[in-house]
Swiss-Prot record:
NCBIfam families: PRK00881.1, purH. GO terms for biological process: 'de novo' IMP biosynthetic process. GO terms for cellular component: cytosol. It comes from Anaeromyxobacter sp. (strain K). The gene is purH. GO terms for molecular function: IMP cyclohydrolase activity; phosphoribosylaminoimidazolecarboxamide formyltransferase activity. Belongs to the PurH family. This is Bifunctional purine biosynthesis protein PurH. The IMP cyclohydrolase activity resides in the N-terminal region. Its EC number is 2.1.2.3, 3.5.4.10. The keyword Chloroplast does not apply.
Amino acid sequence: MTRRALVSVSDKTGLVPFARRLAALGVELLSTGGTQKTLAEAGVPVVGVGDYTQAPEILGGRVKTLHPRVHGGILYRRGLASDEADVKARDIPPIDLVVVNLYPFREAVAAGKPFETCVEEIDIGGPTMVRSAAKNSAHVGVVVDPADYEKVAAELEATRTLSAATRFYLMKKAFAHTAAYDAAISEYLTAREAPEAAPAHFPATLAAVYTKAYDLRYGENPHQAGAFYRAAREPEEPSVAFADVLQGKELSYNNLLDLQAALAGVMEFDETACVIIKHNTPCGVSTGRTAGEAFARARECDPVSAFGGIVALNRPVDEATASELTSLFLECVIAPGYDAAARAALAVKKNLRLLEAPRLGAARATWRRRPEEGRELRSIPGGLLVMDRDLGSVRRDDCKVMTKRAPTEQEWKDLLFAWKVVKHVKSNAIVFAKDDRTVAIGGGQTSRVESVKTAVMKAALDVRGSSVGSDAFFPFADGVEEIIKAGATAIIQPGGSMRDAEVIAAADKAGIAMVATGMRHFRH
């Protein structure tokens, strides 16, 4: 039978109705600080923990519930003779239900509060009570989520106690709650540079907090279950995870992956640009005078693959752009915004998912990345691979001309465009670019020469006179020879092959230009 409950919550959602239902069952309520005040003002009978323990709060409220009469009442094992003797000797009544959620530490961090303020929001007594109650779940219920108030109240009203199954369910939630809380603290401190020294680039222990945003219909395939988890803090750069979904069907696992690929690609450009993604790799990229023109030019690169694609634009969508978008079946569009006319035009495509990421419209120089946002995580069974995100870029001055002929001004422009795109194509990656757009893309092949052949074979536009980007060096001259045969006139690649001399000789023989970046962009 539940006779006594300790209630101390920061999130007071649903608190008073829940407490009233407990009080109506004859449950004695113990409470502290703001929770006690809220209950008393609502007319709910409540006993202050200080009165209960005869030990007033000290240290400005830092010590309230850390007392044997509290934790003894929570932790004692009913029916165990030695525990029964201890609580009897010390006059410690049982506490059968603990209702606690923790100080808003994550909210303080998200609000950008000073370090000292965030530290004060690290809860001590709350997690201790939650863990004590969860450990003793054979006898005690612990509620950390207001969403469980109805379930707990209804069961107590029906049976005056909580079943073993309910207590176990609550125990699991409680330990997940405190684990996430501690991980948030660790993540915050890991990302913060200590006054005396910078932190290790990769910490010895990696703690990260993600909360389930929603279940997905399935994972990559229908036989795989899936869910989407969101970080505690919104990044200061454009983010699919925090974008607003304005219309369309629910997002799928594959939609989210493809949207991220599209967003990452379009974020390379200051100019008005469009990226079209299919199966997590670009099938068309272009800049334009308007967003609509950028989309139309990108679509022309590979109109077959663009069907059913995912589109990212770095400028707001107007009616003219919306008209272009509705000319093709698309799965998703992400952009900084949509005007009213565009929304009306796109509304006819009821299944088209529209996402709005306002920060995408801001100047790239204004985006900031916290240390944890500069990392990329991928799991393997039994482990986690962690690396810096590939945010590398090059300027013209970073490149070394490898051939006798240097690129022309137009070739330089096309080369740097191709280099921005090729880092987002699955390796081995080849991109033909001309006049600020891709004209052919080949990727995902197990040899570089085959990626060149694939790009040329799939090209819907004329590749003659284009410039080519390669995500890694050419191990043999065959890839360069195929590029020459296709009619391209310049190449940008990392360089560094054992056969660089052979590759350069092939380029010089054909009179094409080649530059080395010294930077590789493998993508697996």
